[in-house]
Amino acid sequence: TIKLAKVLEVAVNAQINAGWFGPDVHTRPTSKYDDVENKIDLIAEIDIHSQGLTAHVALGIDVTYAQELKGKISRIQGEIIKNELATVKYYQSQDGHFTGSLNDIPRLVIGVDEERAGIIAKAWYKKNPALKKDPLREQILIELIDQCEAFANYADRMGSAKAAASYRRTKKLLLKVYGSEVTAQKRQEFGKDKVFRQLQILINSL
């Protein structure tokens, strides 16, 4: 599963940079240090030039079981309770204009079940052009948007204004990328993925 998670991380990174989320979103893998110590696999740069909106998002990608996913969400809860956000120690921006640490970035999880991850990994390895329109693109965006909403509301209840504002701002940007509000029908559709379903249960119970 660890090997599959790594292949999925590489595949998702490649697809996002090939235009999965449009021209305004790019991702970069983190350093080995930040992967191991800070549990962050990718940094997403969302840069909507037309409206002067820019944000960095720390992404952890997991092909995992419910118990492990719960630990990821608990870590985010712990950061929010302390009104903290994620930190990446070693980072270079996509355009090369920035090198250094990134502080106070929202942490989110991308969850895909083992069966689905295997299909994506195989399609990526074979350079299957159908991957450009794979439903996982939409599933990931819904996961990220729903987490932003849940973590912002949780931060409100914890009195963590900085965290709440950061997650709300990120949700606003992700909704612009997605292009519409997320419907219950879409959530039900992607609920066939066991990890997507478990993620929904966890964030709805915060």
Where are these regions (language model features)?
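Generic ordered-secondary-structure signal
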Residues: L8-I16, P29, E37, A44, ...
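Catalytic centers of nucleases
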Residues: L4-L69
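Extended aliphatic helical segments
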Residues: V7-V12, V25, V36, V57, ...
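Active-site or metal-binding loop neighborhoods of secreted/extracellular toxin and effector enzymes
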Residues: T99-L206
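Residue-identity detector for glutamine
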Residues: Q15, Q51, Q67, Q77, ...
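Generic structural signal for short, flexible, solvent-exposed coil/loop and linker residues
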Residues: S31, S50, H97-T99, I140
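Catalytic cores of nucleic-acid endonucleases
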Residues: H56-L59, V63-A130
